C-alpha cells in the first residue's frame, strides 16, 4: 500500500469529527481512533511493515520493540512479525497476580529498545512507557508512532532523550480530509 493510499485509508477508517477529550486532557475537534485502523488486517499489516522499515532506518542496532498497552500492542506485534524483532508489552501498572511485571516479555539489561506508539499528542503515554523500560535497565532513545498530532509530544520526548519518528503527521491526514471534503481546492 503506497503512502497516499495508506493516508486515505487511515482517514476513512479512523478520522472522526466532534468534541473529544484526549488522553492528555486537551479538547479536540477531531479524533484519530487507533482501534479503527489497528483492527483492520490490511491496514495493520501495512502499518506493521512501515513501522519495521522505520525501526531499521532510525534504530538499526535495536534488540527489541516495546509498546504501551493497550493501543500500541497490535502495532508492535505487526512490526515484530515484519521485522522478526521480539517485543515487550509495557503495562500501565503491575498486575496484582502472577508475575506482577510492568514489562511483559523477555529482555536483558542494557538492551536497546525502540518504542512503538499509535497516536502521539502530548507524549505522556509514550514517556511513561519509556520510563518503565528504562527502570528495567533497558536503553530507549527512539520512538516511532503512526501519527504525531503535532501538539508537543515530539518536543516532550526530546526533553527526555527520545527522538520521535512519525510515519505520518496530523497535517498529512488533515490535508487528506480537506481534499475529500473539497476535492477541487
Where are the regions that the model predicts?
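PRPP-associated nucleotide enzymes
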Residues: 1-116, 120-185
